[in-house]
Amino acid sequence: MDTPINVFSEWAQNGKDEGMEKHHRDSVMNMLDFACNGLSEYSLIDAGCGNGWVIRHTSNDNRCSRAIGIDGSSNMITKAKRLDNKNQYYCEDLLNWIPSKKVDIVHSMEVFYYFEDPALLINHITKNWIKKEGRLIMGIDFYYENKASHSWPQECCITIMKLHSEKEWKVFFEKAGLKDVKSWRNGQDKDWGGTLIVTGTN
């Protein structure tokens, strides 16, 4: 068993990170379409950006004024910077980092359950990263209702993976002070619950 950061650092070295883009693209596009709908301009942080593929995609949107990626893995950030010298990337602990300017959208895919206390992270992001009326939107595949994901901690040999229900995730958002909290699932199949998407505004 190993920490999430060490596991994903290894993925950055062996190229496994590239599969994350392929597997998560549809759900990420669903989230970005929802979050950016109706906006004439926006700034965005990708929390747990990995190799930066979401930032590279978002920065090609003419409406995007600023795109920032943050990740705890130095290998991932090194790779992101190598692939993209246009945008900003930071290797920092998400629980401690504060951006110089707040943003309109904070997006995160498959990250929050790797924290011992996800509610603490959501509180920190809501308070310190998001503008008034800004949005937090999160996607995860590891959650209680998605039974196919329950074996992942053992299969991936990762020490911290917090299993919560859809209702519990929504409560985390609400207790952080986020309003109009919504959730839905993208990509459901017969034995697959799909990506749980949760969002709310500041």
Question: What is the predicted function of each stretch?
Answer:
Residues H107:
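A conserved beta-strand element that flanks and buttresses the S-adenosyl-L-methionine
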Residues A119-E133:
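A short glycine-rich, Lys/Arg-flanked "PGG" loop and its adjoining helix->strand segment in the class I
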Residues M161-A176:
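Short alpha-helix
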Residues I45-A47, N51-N96:
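Class I SAM-dependent methyltransferase SAM/SAH-binding core
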Residues D141-I160:
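Short, glycine-/aromatic-enriched active-site segment of Class I SAM-dependent methyltransferases
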Residues E133-D141:
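Conserved beta-strand signature within the Rossmann-like core of class I S-adenosyl-L-methionine
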Residues M1-N37, Y144-E145:
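Conserved class I S-adenosyl-L-methionine
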